[in-house]
Amino acid sequence: FGKSNDEAKYIITGNNRDVNRYKWNFNNITTKLKDKKSKQSIFYRNIGALLEIKRKQKAFHPNASRINISLGPKIFCFKRISKDKKQSIICMTNLSSKIQTPNFKKIGSYRDLLNSNLKFREGNSVILKPFQTVWLTNN
């Protein structure tokens, strides 16, 4: 729920995983989620919106095909293809703090499901801002 790292717990236990294992009190998290300006409420609404976008895409069905695409160590990329082969989604995340331009020009015409203002035409370069994720779909 968008909680900052629990460094105090890590210092006590020495277990790296404890840094992100905060245990919420039910009343505390309920209060945070009701506050529309809280980090936890914003995080929860944004995750919900992403899941709603994902739910509507045939290429994200559990039985859809997945192909891993190697674009170097700074970009995580894979392609999902719907069972009926009508939809494909290229998911790319820039894992670095610098702009990345993956060598990925021949992908056809796509639009970004996460940002409706981004559209890519055949031959255009994809430019990823630091830590940006795109879900590029062909329909």
Regions from the PLM with identified roles:
Residues 50, 110, 131:
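A residue-level signal for conserved active-site and pocket-lining positions in enzyme catalytic cores
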Residues 6, 18, 112, 126-127:
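Intrinsically disordered, low-complexity, compositionally biased regions/tails
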Residues 93, 111-112, 126, 134:
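Intrinsic-disorder/low-complexity peptide segments enriched for small residues
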